[in-house]
Amino acid sequence: MKKLIYNKVIPFKGFTAINLFGFIFARKEYESRIERDYLRKFVLLNHELIHTAQYKELLYVFYLPLYMLNYAVNIFIYRFNFKKAYKNICFEREAFKYEYSNYYLDRRSKFSWLKFVFKR
């Protein structure tokens, strides 16, 4: 199982974990809660590993610019409802939809996140 990097800085407060270029960072204050709950850890890691697959498809350098562009567009689509804008980022929609799936990453087609670009 992929290792989480626990710390007090990354991600910002309000977030549990973030994937940056394939490295998964989690807030230190959530460590005991994550580590003692196998399902919570599995879902968290699975979600972030879906993002790693997305990073790889976009050669790592194009992922964050596309992610931020999608978020910026969504902010206007969802009338400055930042949470809804975040939840509807195409990369997040794929990750949220399949985070509980045991075999999704093994069976996932390349660029699967594209299915979520225009589908609302």
Enumerate the predicted regions with their spans.
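Generic, well-ordered alpha-helical segments
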Residues: R36-D37, K41, E57, V61, ...
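Catalytic Zn2+-binding segment of zinc metalloproteases
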Residues: L49-L66
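Short pre-active-site segment immediately N-terminal to the catalytic Zn-binding motif
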Residues: G14-A17, I24-L45
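Metalloprotease/metallohydrolase-associated module, dominated by Zn2+-dependent proteases
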Residues: K2-L4, F12-F15, N19, F62-R120
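Soluble or luminal CAZymes and related metallo-dependent hydrolases
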Residues: K41-L45, I50, K87-F91
